């Protein structure tokens, strides 16, 4: 859980860069974190260039709109999934990545062989939500881990071996235009 001191009703958006060469300046109303498997959530400050395919979380006061300009990515991307023996957050092996292509990634195209070593062969497709939603404050309304869960703050777990039997509802989507 990402607990930063921001209001616990703040809605977090999990996202990735919509391409390459995307710059962003973190202002005084924004909390921005990047996921690192070894360090967990790492706070981002100042002006930065988003790493394509890296996972980020953002929340802010109010509802500002951000415009991000990016160069499209047309090449294949290899993402190295890691499992550190121990880390400070106790969440070793949790890899979070985002789709930086301008088209969805169909989870049916992955096979168990795409997951190396003892990594869990499961996709977790998250729906953005608040800290309170993630910690069960709205538990009666949720279908935590259920197939097709669209409740904010919840996810859908898809075993890689089962992905070929699912419909396109379970694509890893791109950022909407």
Question: Where are the model-predicted features located?
Answer:
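Charged, amphipathic alpha-helical scaffolding segments
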Residues: 33-71, 149-177
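Hydrophobic beta-strand positions in blades of beta-propellers and related beta-sheet-rich domains
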Residues: 30-39, 123, 131
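Long, internal scaffold/assembly segments composed of regular secondary structure
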Residues: 90-177
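A short, polar beta-strand/turn micro-motif
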Residues: 1-28, 43-122
């Amino acid at each position: 859980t990402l607990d930063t001191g921001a209001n616990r009703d703040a809605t977090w958006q999990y996202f990735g860069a919509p391409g390459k060469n995307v710059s962003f300046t973190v202002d005084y109303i924004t909390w921005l974190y990047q996921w690192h498997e070894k360090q967990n959530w790492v706070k981002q400050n100042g002006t930065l260039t988003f790493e394509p395919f890296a996972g980020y979380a953002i929340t802010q006061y109010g509802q500002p709109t951000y415009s991000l300009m990016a160069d499209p990515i047309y090449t294949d991307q290899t993402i190295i999934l890691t499992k550190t023996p121990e880390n400070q957050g106790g969440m070793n092996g949790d890899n979070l990545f985002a789709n930086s292509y301008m088209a969805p990634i169909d989870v049916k195209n992955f096979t168990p062989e795409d997951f190396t070593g003892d990594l869990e062969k499961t996709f977790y497709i998250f729906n953005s939500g608040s800290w309170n939603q993630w910690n069960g404050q709205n538990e009666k309304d949720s279908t935590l881990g259920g197939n097709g869960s669209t409740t904010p703050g919840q996810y859908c777990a898809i075993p890689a071996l089962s992905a070929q039997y699912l419909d396109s509802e379970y694509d890893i989507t791109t950022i909407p235009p």
